[in-house]
Amino acid sequence: MAVKPLSSTPSHPIQIISHDTVYSGCSEKGVCTWKGIPYAKSTAGEGRFRPPQIPEKVDEIVADQFGPACPQHKHLNVPKNENCLNLNIWARFGAKRRPVLFYIHGGSFMSGTGSDPVFDGQELVAAENIVVVTINYRLGVLGILDFSFLGDRFTPNCAILDVCMALRWTYEHIADFGGNPDNITVMGESAGGSIVSLLPTLPEAAQYISKCVISSGVPTEFWTKSQAQQMAQAYMKFMGISSAEELLAISAERIGDSTQDFTQYTKLGAASYEPSVDGKIIRDFPLVSVQQAEFKKIPMWIGMTRDEMSFLTFSILSRRWGLAKLMEEGTDEESAALREKIIKIYDETYDKDDARIQLYSDMVIRAPLIWYAEEASQTTHVWFYRMDWSSRIMDKLGIKAFHSSDLPFFFGNFNFPANRIYYQGKEEKKIVKTIGRSIQRDLATFMDSGTLPWETASERFIGKCYGDEIRYEEIMPKEIRDYWRQTTYHERSFISAWQSNNKGTNQ
């Protein structure tokens, strides 16, 4: 790291030089932070619905404040605008060629930001001598919907192009911040995990990555081109417009504010925004590409939580995710006999109050992840993990080890307001720190060596399960895995986007 520090004591400025630009950040408790670094030009005006562009070179970038988030629903109370393609870096003072964690946030492709406190890299970098990078990418209408039917002015999958650009910037600059460009691990959760499942299949991205961590991603969460364009046409109808000029004239704020309302209009909830197989950027569904061994054979660590979809027991969240539609599309093509058998085996395997939660969790998230791992493990090494721990309050609320509950453990961030309420009392706080250190050490080991000290994905699908006690057991019972393999859902998930007009996804 070519540093020019005033001091390494808390909250003092620190500077590095990369590609003839000075980056001014902050140093606190031995960890240096650079926030809001632009990796591409603003996407406002002429940049809207177009590929990201390399930013103009400047003499200095003051990187001591997080940059704007991408336009989205107003519930996210941070600055938001179209000049949102920025990233954040955490590295130990004096770091040199350390493994790099490139983290992609989730949010159903319509919300979220790399500056979320849960992804703050301070604690993780202090605990494990790695470099952490978090990014913003375009979301929802601006980043996902395909308006290319309006003309060449409109590019599909801008969100994916943004991630590829951020990866390229990281590869080209991270050595000057203390990272090793030849050892970049991409990690993402939920929608971010879905993107990570795609990246090894994209030559534009795969050239920069050496390992990947998929946390509760859905590798079936992709549309065909025609479906993506139908959704874009539905958005124009929803907004009461019919031309490219009208679409380009809508303010970013109005587009962001419409993001959530549009999901109610479509009645698809969280499935209203999904990347699509356009033939140029995304060649096919990730499951199909991996099955055909058309991906970079890198080590993979794939994980999930014990009770992924438990929060959907809350009606407001069930409506937001479009749970009724998810369930309908996940089972409507199955025979009545098979549906009955699947429900029966869940009732026999789990407690009465837990059976439906586990069924939803497997259908929406865990079954597609296991199918992806099955195919990838034919040509590369794959490991599993599962987050099983839940606090007394989480159990009382019925959310248990819910979707994304593993993230504070990876990053070591248990004290910010959104999570603090879950961990009460000295004993629980001690437990979460112990589990956090375990999962952080495993992450650092994986990033450094590309291996983990338990068996790879096999017929038994053994994973490391983080709870009050560490266990190694099947991620999903074999009997349940076998039933899911019999489904039409499984069959159509492996049909190329170019062979069928049907959606190869559970959404």
Where do the language-model regions lie?
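Non-catalytic accessory segments of hydrolases
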Residues: A2-C158, P181, G269, I421-I439, ...
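A structural signal for well-ordered alpha-helical segments within the folded catalytic domains
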Residues: C32, E82-L85, L161-R168, S194, ...
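Serine-hydrolase-like catalytic core of hydrolytic proteins
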Residues: K74-A244, D261, V290-T313
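Non-transmembrane alpha-helical segments in soluble domains
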Residues: L101, C164-L167, Y171, S197, ...
